[in-house]
Design a protein with these regions (language model features):
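Histidine/acidic residue-rich metal-binding segments in metalloenzymes
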Residues: 2-101, 111-135
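Short, catalytically relevant binding-site loops at active-site mouths
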Residues: 81-83, 105-108, 141-144
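Extended low-complexity acidic/polar segments
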Residues: 90-112, 154-175
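His/Asp/Glu-enriched, well-ordered alpha-helical/loop segment
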Residues: 126-181
Length: 181
C-alpha cells in the first residue's frame, strides 16, 4: 500500500453488483475518508468501483454541490466502461477529482460498449483534462463481467500486460510519452 494514502474503497456505484448506497451514506463515507486523511496527514480518498448504469457519477456531483467535501477525495475506477461515464469522469477531473481508466477492459479481450483505454487517454489529453488527475490500472487479473444479449453474464479476466500495451498505443496515438506515463 501507499503510505501517503488513507481511504475507503472500492464502493460500487451505478453497478449491478452495488449494494446501492444512498446519497446520505455516500456523504458520510466521503466525509469520513476526508477527515481520516486530515487527521493522519494523508490523502483521505474514496475509491469508487463504477459500473455502466445510467446514473454514472451523478450522485458524486450532487455530493460535491451539497457538501464541503472537495472533489480531490473521489477516485472513480473503470471510467472508460462507457462513453457517458468517461465524459462524467473528465468533468470530475476538471473539478479537481481523479479518474482511473481500466486498461484491462479492451475490445480485443472481448469487452464491448466501452472506450478503448488508449483512446480515453488521448481524449483526456486533447480535451485539456488535467493529466495529473488521470491514472490507468490493469485491474490485474480481476474478473470482469460482460452482459450478454440473452441476459446472462460472461466473465472475462483483465490481463496484466494490457497496461503496457495501452500506454504504448496512447503514445503512438500522439500522447507525449511523459504525459502518458
Amino acid at each position: 500500500l501507499i503510505d501517503k494514502v488513507l481511504g475507503i474503497g472500492e464502493v460500487a456505484l451505478s453497478d449491478h453488483r452495488s449494494s446501492q448506497p444512498t446519497k446520505d451514506e455516500m456523504k458520510r463515507i466521503a466525509t469520513q475518508a476526508r477527515l481520516g486523511g486530515m487527521l493522519s496527514g494523508k490523502a483521505g480518498v474514496l475509491q469508487l468501483h463504477m459500473g455502466s448504469g445510467k446514473s454514472g457519477l451523478s450522485m458524486i456531483f450532487e455530493i460535491l454541490d451539497e457538501t464541503e467535501v472537495p472533489a480531490r477525495h473521489f477516485i472513480p475506477t473503470h471510467v472508460n466502461r462507457c462513453p457517458k461515464l468517461l465524459r462524467q469522469a473528465k468533468e470530475l477531473a476538471r473539478r479537481g477529482g481523479y479518474m482511473d481508466i481500466t486498461s484491462g477492459g479492451r475490445l480485443c479481450d472481448g469487452f464491448t460498449g466501452g472506450v478503448e483505454p488508449h483512446e480515453a487517454i488521448r481524449q483526456c489529453y486533447e480535451e485539456g483534462v488535467p493529466m495529473d488527475h488521470v491514472t490507468m490500472s490493469s485491474d490485474g487479473n480481476g474478473g470482469m463481467s460482460v452482459p450478454q444479449p440473452d441476459g446472462t453474464v460472461k466473465l472475462l479476466t483483465a490481463r496484466l500486460h494490457s497496461l503496457h500495451e495501452e500506454l504504448r498505443q496512447a503514445v503512438l496515438d500522439g500522447v507525449p510519452l511523459e504525459v502518458a506515463v
